[in-house]
């Protein structure tokens, strides 16, 4: 099975050490850990600083990586950091997902783990918006009838900046995501949509 993980710096594996930052090794990035522990082909499509796309390039994204069984998207943190509310971020996410829904794959929406006070997160209001984002995404997933992963209860450890995962955070995220994938696998198996030119199966 091929899973495309579309996200921001926490999907990419950004490590905020040094002046310009760095990247965790493959053994400490949740995407690579997911691949190692499941045996599935996991595509890391994370990018530092990425917000929810507002330009219609979703089809190009699909053709670049086709065929894809599951499109896992986890975005919204950078939107909040740039001043958007949780509701505004959810509206952007809905517009983005509506570009993808007619085209082939199963979408899995994940809420980013909540931020905490830190070097990048100066206010409690920002933390509250990051918690509220999961509530907005849950409602959106119900509206679009797609699986949803709520990471709020995973207690992901974050670095000093209040945004990025620590190594332990990446490992915990991978473990929890594997459990979540297993719990929704029946639904994925029975709702899997894939490009018509490619026959495939789920987990």
What is the meaning of each model-derived region?
Residues 28-33, 37, 57-203:
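Alpha-helical cap/lid subdomain in secreted, periplasmic
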Residues 1-47, 51, 59-67, 171-172:
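Serine-esterase "nucleophile elbow" of acetyl-processing enzymes
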